[in-house]
Amino acid sequence: MNQTWRAHLQCKLQQLHEQGQYRDLHVTEKAEETWLIRDKKRMLNLASNNYLGLAGDERLKEAAIACTKRYGTGATASRLVVGNHLLYEEVERSICDWKGTERALIVNSGYTANIGAISSLASRHDIVFSDKLNHASIVDGIILSGAEHKRYRHNDLDHLEKLLKMASPEKRKLIVTDTVFSMDGDTAYLRDLVQLKEKYGAIIIVDEAHASGIYGIGGAGLSHIEKNLSQKIDIHMGTFSKALGCYGAYLTGDEIYIEYLQNMMRSFIFTTALPPSTLGAVQKAIEIVKEDNERRENLIANGEYFRTKLRDAGFDIGNSSTHIVPIVVGSNEHALRFSKRLQEAGIAAIAIRPPTVPVHSSRIRFAVTSQHTIADLKWAIDRIIHIAKEEELFV
């Protein structure tokens, strides 16, 4: 190996170790279940994004198997070549019916959806206004676009309006936000954001990755909680990999936006399409979440119970109002130690560190699901409190 490169990489890895930011992989089994096996130890799963428990649902498995048997294991090409299977058309129609939009485009992941859409729509002639806690894929899309990047303080709409007022009138404006923030569990003020985008002549993209399948009518997303709000949002992005228990993502909105992305989005054009098995499972998952209110209600109730108990115990859970509940501890060292103790106690809960979250805000990110019982959550809470007191860290 080239010795110059070896020395450089070894130095960088050593720095990660010293900063408490080194990451490694752990073998995990049964992650689709409430109790998983990690490094051969049974643990309560409080770390996955299988929010509605659909990743292990027999109906999705059967749909995936049926499509594999009928259509094979691969798409064989990109969608613009010969990979645009009839299943794509069917699922995209289902998304439009679900979201109340004109057209949809299925892509391979939430990450590729965001980097592709933002970098295709925006250019050096434009300004993108982005919440400071938006997902990395949004940030990367803005960087790729070459647009002027204005980050407003998290959920601070006065700051956003100030930036909009200061923006050059010659530049097109794009506002982009998560709806449920993935590391904090709080939500965007969508109604106010829409009012600002209309007032200042911008368009808005919302990332519903952690809200699709959970909130709004039929689980269509946070943008569907308020009447007539969703139609005022220009582009909706959502994933199939979280509440829907599958893989992939979608972009949906007015015809003109989706037609443009189909023709200009490099992360869509230059990649092989998703396999038929995934599309079959996604179609079944959409059918289920539109009708199964009980799963959504269980998830929301579990999130409320877990948040309340942790907050009452004295933990800093920020402004979480959803199924994602962080305990913010500050340093990498504290987060890693807490995570290690939790896993030793049988709780799968992972330390989240910079650059995923801001410096000095390392945390344990818990994610409850609809499949957890109150007994599961009480068992976990008791251990979380006990370990925190024992370590003299937080309570």
From Swiss-Prot:
Residues that hold pyridoxal 5'-phosphate according to the record: G110, Y111, S182, D207, E208, A209, H210, T239, F240, S241, K242
Keyword Transferase recorded: yes
Modified residues (N6-(pyridoxal phosphate)lysine): K242
Protein family (similarity comment): Belongs to the class-II pyridoxal-phosphate-dependent aminotransferase family. BioF subfamily.
Assigned EC number: 2.3.1.47
NCBIfam families in the cross-refs: bioF
Residue pairs linked by disulfide bridges in the UniProt entry: none
InterPro entries: Aminotrans_II_pyridoxalP_BS, Aminotransferase_I/II_large, AON_synthase_class-II, AONS_Archaea/Proteobacteria, PyrdxlP-dep_Trfase, PyrdxlP-dep_Trfase_major, PyrdxlP-dep_Trfase_small
Transmembrane segments: none
UniProt KW Transferase keyword: yes
Keywords: Biotin biosynthesis, Pyridoxal phosphate, Transferase
Signal sequence range: none
Pathway(s) of this molecule: Cofactor biosynthesis; biotin biosynthesis
Name of the protein described by the UniProt record: Putative 8-amino-7-oxononanoate synthase
Catalytic activity: 6-carboxyhexanoyl-[ACP] + L-alanine + H(+) = (8S)-8-amino-7-oxononanoate + holo-[ACP] + CO2
Cofactor (UniProt): pyridoxal 5'-phosphate
Amino-acid positions noted as binding substrate in the UniProt annotation, renumbered to this chain: R23, H135, T356
An annotated Gene Ontology molecular function: pyridoxal phosphate binding
Name of a matching Pfam family: Aminotran_1_2
Subunit structure: Homodimer.
Function: Catalyzes the decarboxylative condensation of pimeloyl-[acyl-carrier protein] and L-alanine to produce 8-amino-7-oxononanoate (AON), [acyl-carrier protein], and carbon dioxide.
A biological-process GO annotation: biotin biosynthetic process
